[in-house]
């Protein structure tokens, strides 16, 4: 709608398709964690501009045991406190989780990041993002209760299948009875 008011036209495609194509063409986005590190402060903007291609690239990096993206959790020595590089990615996923359309994919990415997260100095971790997104009394998503419940169940099943990692996201299971739907 805004592109119409700004009289922004792209021949042969919508402006969203144009932006998606640009993000898809970023070299290394789907196979080099260093790009995510270098773009850390811009990742929320990139994710909001082209959610599909952003999630596609991240899901590619998270394939297998996540070794391709695990280095973003490394902490560098800072002047006073250590510096970590995962915050921009986490904030991008939190922003996408507000939209029901992207909630499942964002939640799965956060859960996979939580599984490979070795912990560290900061308490603001991917697991805490999942908690705040699905918080029963104040969820950080616009998705209705039924959708949130279904996603929590899918996450529980998905990570049960992966085996040995379910304990990290086991906090989700008790939330299901707390989130009651209206009859």
Predicted segments — roles?
Residues 1-183:
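Non-catalytic all-alpha helical scaffold/repeat segments
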């Amino acid at each position: 709608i805004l592109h119409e008011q700004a009289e922004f036209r792209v021949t042969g495609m919508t402006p969203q398709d144009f932006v998606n194509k640009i993000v898809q063409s970023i070299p290394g986005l789907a196979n080099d964690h260093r790009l995510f590190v270098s773009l850390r402060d811009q990742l929320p903007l990139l994710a909001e501009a082209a959610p599909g291609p952003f999630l596609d690239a991240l899901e590619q990096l998270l394939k297998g045991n996540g070794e391709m993206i695990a280095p973003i959790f490394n902490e560098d020595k800072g002047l006073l406190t250590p510096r970590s590089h995962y915050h921009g990615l986490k904030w991008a996923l939190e922003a996408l989780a507000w939209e029901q359309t992207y909630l499942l994919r964002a939640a799965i990415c956060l859960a996979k990041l939580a599984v490979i997260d070795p912990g560290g100095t900061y308490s603001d971790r991917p697991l805490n993002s999942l908690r705040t997104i699905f918080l029963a009394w104040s969820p950080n998503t616009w998705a209705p209760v039924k959708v949130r419940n279904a996603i929590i169940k899918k996450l529980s099943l998905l990570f049960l299948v992966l085996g040995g990692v379910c304990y990290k996201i086991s906090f989700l299971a008790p939330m299901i009875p707390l989130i009651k739907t209206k009859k």
